[in-house]
């Protein structure tokens, strides 16, 4: 925030502004930034290609969306592994630590070959629905990204205007002019220029009076918005330009000191940034990998991600090659940019995000009567974690709601909730609020395969003293069968989760599992298929347990995930086999014993559950492809000791940000 304030007030002295208008404009921009501090994420992994069953080691960089400093306030970051059908394979929750947001995702055994996506976000980022943070990884082969072919539709602000706004980059200056063949442009217009909501110019413009912006006066790099405003500060025309990304970069050097090789064949490698300012430090992640190809144009990196991908509405993950040629000009002409809502902000329409910043984990719910579903006021709710020795108690409010805040425990922690009336009676119904995670509904970045296997037999490291080089060993075994379509009903289902699917996903409850099914939504504990709208109102899907239908108000939390063998979802014409009751869709649950009885469920005032706790970082195991993985390095320079054999056929990749928000990206072969 300090850097943002400095840049904004510095702009006041670099532009010719009307004092009153300028002060109002700046106050509105600052108010919007304070009301809604936006964030961006970037995922750095230990590789780009994997095999089924391997572990993806990762670090998430969480930065302020405006100045790219790591001063964002969210405490948690969520990372999802999405399969080629956009379904969540794994989801982890990372907590802020001294190393940043560091964690891992284990790829399930048996997943199909394909391009998968790592999707990262905070709860605060969910306030923006058209800006996704995606990173492609390839399982079962190598691939590269292709530039997305955007349509010819342009920003809706430009579509109804006959005024031509021209922006020309001429060496070290930007020339801005307006033209309207059908009008003399006698109206009063102003030009407003900003980069990620930081105002860089505001002043009058007219036909025949061009605006010249010098390189030195533009303090930011990335996507620039040039807005033509009328006398009411309403945007008439907007044009986007990708300019001066070097202003956001902090170049670093990696030097291999071969002359200082130690007796154990370790060679120093010095990483430093000569352009660091006073007090500025680096916060980077690093990996050393086997360099089997030098073609990196089909990969994305932190520079293109923060400066381009996350600043364009509905923009997919783009390869770095897009920013190295004139392709970005055409792409921006077909995109819109409303992330920072500047067209509204300059008119005084400042808004706060509907979803608050997540600063602590919360367990909440409602207590109501068994008959009539009336709220129980001043009810007593106990929260117990037997394996952590934790106990807390609270009371319900007038609406019967309760909340436990600051529940920070690792993943897999088990909890027990029980509720009573003020008089200590247990004849109540306890409803638990479940965490909702948005499904990814956007398009998939285009790509192409470059090879079919990620096994690198030629990447064997030098054998240590006394080591033995073994011949290739093949291991054969019978794959266990997990049939998810073992009967006539299941074979006609539109979507099924078998036992292996349930085990690999690790869902904590049935609602979390069902949220992964396309067109299935969960609202207030009820499941709806395709919206569930009928003539007589909104109706949930029918629930069948071991082939027997239960009442609409049946609580699926009564079924423990350890008892579930299969879940089948019927949402199309397949519901006909269930009769009229299946008109709004059917969710069929098959238990392992096959004799589930509603009478055997736990008490209505008690719930045992497991939340999505934070992940505990684990140590890295080096492998032939990535022998070195350092997710968190902080300082002004770094000295690494690496084996001498890394000097050939290995490259080092360093990415991160500085304390001043400058972006670091370096790729180079060691020893060169």
Language model segments and positions:
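Short amphipathic beta-strand segments in non-cytosolic proteins
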Residues: 78-89, 192-200, 288-293, 379-393, ...
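Short, polar/charged loop or turn motifs at beta-strand boundaries
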Residues: 489-515, 529-532, 548-550, 593
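Short, acidic Ser/Thr/Gly-rich low-complexity loop/linker segments typical of extracellular
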Residues: 92-96, 204-205, 390-399, 627-635
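Non-catalytic regulatory/gating segments with a bias toward low-complexity or hydrophobic composition
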Residues: 513-514, 566-568, 587-589
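Periplasmic plug
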Residues: 526-571, 593, 597-602, 654
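Short, acidic, small-residue-rich periplasmic hinge/interaction motif at the N-terminus
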Residues: 444-500, 596-600
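Beta-strand-rich structural segments
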Residues: 39-67, 144-149, 169-179, 226-227, ...
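Acidic glycine/proline-rich low-complexity segments
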Residues: 125-152, 156-162, 238-243, 277-354, ...
